[in-house]
Amino acid sequence: LWFFGLSGSGKSYASNYINKYIAKSFIIDGDEIRSNISFDLGYCLDDRKKQVKRIFGLATICINQGFFPLISTVYFDKKLTNNLRSIGINLIEIKRNSKIRRKIYRKKYKV
């Protein structure tokens, strides 16, 4: 399962909650990947696409080893999310009605 939405919307909370109930689940958090693996990337569209490709690669390795990845990331590109859906990835968008949070996020990451 791939959860996506704005920062603070509850993606990690949902992953952690579901992780308790699914055997052999594995949490992949976009913030942790960015700080430990993708620290060389920024927040421009191309870098965010590279980040998603890296996460997808890690998730594929987990699936091949018999784990069930629960992924939490911030991502907004409809084309990429549609591509992920077309290959069978279950995407769940987590939304929170907060105009202020959205404005802060967009200003911080220039999106």
Named regions from a protein language model:
Residues I18, L41-Y43, N83-I87, R106-K108:
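Short, glycine/charged-enriched secondary-structure capping and boundary segments
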Residues L6-S7, S12:
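The conserved Walker
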Residues S12-T60:
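Conserved substrate/cofactor phosphate-moiety recognition/catalytic segment
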Residues K95-V111:
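Small-molecule kinase domains that catalyze NTP-dependent phosphoryl transfer to phosphate-bearing small molecules
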Residues C44-L91, K95-S98:
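Glycine-rich phosphate-binding loop used to anchor ATP phosphates in small-molecule kinases
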Residues S38, T81, R102:
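A short local structural element in Rossmann-fold oxidoreductases
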Residues F3:
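Hydrophobic anchor at the beta1->P-loop junction of P-loop NTPases
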